[in-house]
Amino acid sequence: MRNTTIPPIYYCCAWYFIFCGGLAVLVPYLPVIFRHWNLSPSQIGIIAACKPLIGFGIQPIWGQIADYTKLHGQIHAFCLFASACGYGSLYFQKREFGRILAHVLVTETFGSGGFFLADNATNFIVSKHLERNPRSSISYGKVRLWGAVGWGYVFAPLMGLVLTEEKNAQFAPFLAYVILFSMASAIALRMEHHEKEVVDEGDDAEIVVMNDDEGENERMVGVASSSSRNRGGGGRGGRVGADGTPSKMKRTASFADFNDVSKRTFRIVTEPSAFLVFLLFLLMALSMALTDTYLFLHLETLGAPPILMGLALFFTCVAEVPVFFHEKKIKEFLGLDRSMLLIFVAYIFRQLGYASLKSFGSPWFVLPLQLLHGITFGLYWSVGVEFSRLLAPEDLRAAVMGFFSGMNSLGAFLGAICGGRVYDRVGGGSLFFIAAVGNTILSLVFALKMAFGKRVVPTTNTVVDNIIEIDMSGFVRLESSMPPSSSLSDAGERDDLDIDRSIDSRI
């Protein structure tokens, strides 16, 4: 009997479908459920704002723990199962604001690592799949689109139908959430996040021990066999073959301790050009939070029926799926800079449209505006994940991905808090008009920098290793020239931190 195994890429597709389906059966309906539990709109807004704030602080920590322990799959599964237990038991919580808020915050603390760790695994699995199948057209977006299918095409409409037909079935969203997130937790254990470590025990194997920049922790790195010595020494802490390319190096011992992971991650994400890009991601997330939190309130004041709100969610996924499917071609055609500019421009048109709905005379004009969600979220998330992947060395990708997810959460927090204050004072139409003006200013500054040859997205990852060049098509290139070195000891006299980064980026 033929022994068949499920390709890892299929686990990723199934995970996004199940996970986003789990979100769809509960998250869009939570404000309505909280309202039925006698929470005021301001209290609901506080809960909505605090959730992303917890994510901003906790998600990078989960990423660092995963990179330090290398237990990405187990941590991923734990976060999902913790979220299932937390939100599942929320139904039985006393209907008091303080208890509900505390319950949600504890749940988010332990469950906020579910999403970005899946993105980390998907990027790795897609890369390995393309190495084995160079002609494959698979990409991150073609995997991620299954989340939009699960959210908008299947589970959100299905739960809406259940709640419409069974008005007393308030437990249904919580029960469905527990079932789907438990399934996602089981799938997470099958997802790969990194190469399995292989110890070369050959006779020619050599172990080089290097101290970090504070001399506190030692790293052991297995390097090429002694035969490579005759072909040249390793520049910048590595070995260079006859063709000038670095020979492979593999870890044979544990990674640096947690403090070192945190410090290296901090250096990477706070490098000025990289941090500027993360700030732009934060502003995009702020605009997204304004839409997610206040669009339906604005539609309600315009007399929109509930069915229109459901169709608005459906239309977002209609546009999101093709964008995710073609995201690789879009990024290759536009580059990361122009892709980010396109996102800001799409927000301008989307928010101006929301502000003008009253002038249009009907809230139903919101439906064509929702098609821009494919750019404002689909392309935004794809660019953010791609930038994080290219910015980080392989052993820090989950940590950097967690920082991107954390900045997204901080933007959502600011959008919920600031947007609520503006909404209370001037209303939904003026709120979206002000946001459109802000995005117009950002777009003009962005375009001017590009026009004068100033790339906003950094083209060289100088923090990790200067040989890594991130071009605007989303590819990683190795520079042809490497500083010559006759022996490993020559490289050992260089700055310890530079050696560490060079080694880490090639593993």
Region spans (language model):
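A membrane-interface helix-boundary motif in multi-pass transporters
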Residues: 160-179, 421-440
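Intracellular juxtamembrane helix-capping segments at the cytosolic ends
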Residues: 30, 113-131, 379-393
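Cytoplasmic helix-loop-helix junction between adjacent transmembrane helices
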Residues: 104-146
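Loop-to-transmembrane helix entry/capping segments in MFS-fold secondary transporters
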Residues: 41-42, 130-146, 306, 394-404
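Juxtamembrane intracellular "pre-TM" segments in multi-pass secondary transporters
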Residues: 1-6, 195-233, 237-278, 467-475
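Helix-loop boundary and gating motifs at the non-cytosolic
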Residues: 2-52, 274-280, 285-312
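C-terminal ends and interior cores of transmembrane alpha-helices
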Residues: 81-95, 346-359
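Helix-to-loop junctions at the C-terminal end of transmembrane segments
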Residues: 57-71, 162-164, 322-336, 423-424
